Amino acid sequence: MMTILLQHTHLKNRLMPFLLALFLAGCTTFLGGGSASLLQSDANANSDFYMNKVYQAQNLEEQHTYKLLAARVLVTENKIPQAQALLNELTTLTDEQVLDKSIIEAHIAAVKQQNTVADTQLKHINLAQLSRSQLARYYDVAARIAENRYDAIEAVKARIQIDQLLSDVSRKQANIDRTWSLLRNANRGVINNTVAEGNIALGGWLALTRAYNQNLSNPAQLSQAIQQWKTAYPTHPAAYLFPTELQGLFNFQQTQFSQVALLLPLSGNAQVIGNTIKAGFDAAKDNSATQVQVFDTAATPVDVIFDQVKQAGIRTVVGPLLKQNVDMLLNNAQLVQGLDVLTLNSTSNERAIGQLCYYGLSPEDEAESAANKMWKDGIRTPSVFVPQNDLGRRTASAFNVRWQQLAATDANIRFYNLPADITYTLDDQNTSGVYIVAMSDQLAEIKTTIDNSGRTTKLYASSRSNSANNAPEYRLLMEGLQFSDIPFFKDVTSNQYKKIEKLTKGDFSLMRLYAMGADAWLLINHFNELRQVPGYNIDGLTGKLSAGANCNIERDMTWFQYQSGGIISLN
């Protein structure tokens, strides 16, 4: 017995160093491992977490590792200057740290649109030395460079490489969604003419995109085409994790209704606005058999109207128009339960609610259109001149959000109380283009100021300045300036234009409202298609209409230019 106990004791003593080493190795793995292990893994925390780790680091190597992790995350948080500042602090690095730093530097260059620099940095990286996580980051930078160059196919090829390296389901889904977004927005000619050349995954993606493009105008057929694609490509990554925005197609039902409620202010202060929108709605309805029941929101509270709508068995609603009434719906979402609702305005409180979409002639649409137009025109340092009021703040915010998406930097926003204020913002501004929101008389003063400054800056304006009262002298003064407005104004010789011009006495503001009413009828008749079919759009009088975030109907504006005393359409 004693012999057995002694043998057990000796065995335990011999095993203790081994067990201790094994335990420590397990702890190292659990706590994140050494520097190389940390850098070779995903950085799932925010930058503040890693900066705190920097201050807790026991030695310089560990400190550098956490600075690299913080810099990596700062780039994804779009905090480029902070990331660069951290990298500049790094001095003596290990080989593993130098390798990881090179990926971060390439990522920063790609975000800053320095594509040649980013490309060169990637080419100097030895792929054999990268972990799966680092390889995924490498190809993510490659995809970003390709996107910067508008090369959707090369970006997709990089995304396919990323998919093979990811194991986390949520990250795989995000990568598939990004891949699909690239293809859906790609030029159709590029999609149709690209050959997969043995790349099975690319071939599947191209087939899915072609099926989508060919059937987009007929969502019922599109749903069938998607099902057929899944049958033909059962092992494709997108067959396992289908693009999120396409998943609703499997339950798609075409828009159908026999009754619709129209909610407008038809008395009181907003009577003219309500009646003009109704006239456009009625004209677009024309001889349709659909029954329209009209409710005056100035005479009856909106919550009462919605109860009446439900009691009448109506399941489709257009309106209300006034912001306070839209906000009331948002605060009492149960009112719209069981209904398809297209409001005729949006508010700052807007959010996604089941069967509800927002439509209106918002300044945000024009601001986003202006940012897109200026970017396409090669403008890289824009200034935005807007009035110091709610309209100006909304316009500036929308323009800047879109500009950040396009250029990864802020636009130069300037608010004014009087047109003369613009003088003080011109002196030291190295701007290549100016977007101006102003009434026509204010715009005339602003343009004169800019012209007199001797600057050769491209000028853009919102529809706010486009008025029927603008005389020939005004149009000559505006020579070269481009402005956005609804496409309805493209053909001023059409019978439809002349009819609406007569009805509204040539008031452009009322003509826009009439066009809005006509498009409200168009939109409600394509309600399910807009909500469920990504990329679905219809050509309306107020723009090319599609559903964006929160089912906010977005309008792609038409651009015009003053030329030799006249106005020409640029679209």
UniProtKB/Swiss-Prot annotation:
GO-annotated cellular components: periplasmic side of cell outer membrane
Covalent lipidation (N-palmitoyl cysteine), chain numbering: C27
Highest taxon listed in the record's lineage: Bacteria
One of the GO BP terms on file: regulation of cell shape
Keyword list, A-Z: Cell outer membrane, Cell shape, Lipoprotein, Membrane, Palmitate, Peptidoglycan synthesis, Signal
Membrane topology per record: Lipid-anchor
Localisation: Cell outer membrane
Lipidated sites in chain (S-diacylglycerol cysteine): C27
Keyword Calcium: no
Main location (coarse class): membrane
Pfam families: LppC (PF04348)
Signal peptide range in chain numbering: 1-26
GO molecular function, a single term: enzyme regulator activity
Quaternary structure and partners: Interacts with PBP1a.
Function of the protein: Regulator of peptidoglycan synthesis that is essential for the function of penicillin-binding protein 1A (PBP1a).
Family as reported in the entry's similarity comment: Belongs to the LpoA family.
Protein's UniProt name: Penicillin-binding protein activator LpoA
Organism: Pasteurella multocida (strain Pm70)
Lineage: Bacteria, Pseudomonadati, Pseudomonadota, Gammaproteobacteria, Pasteurellales
Gene that encodes it: lpoA
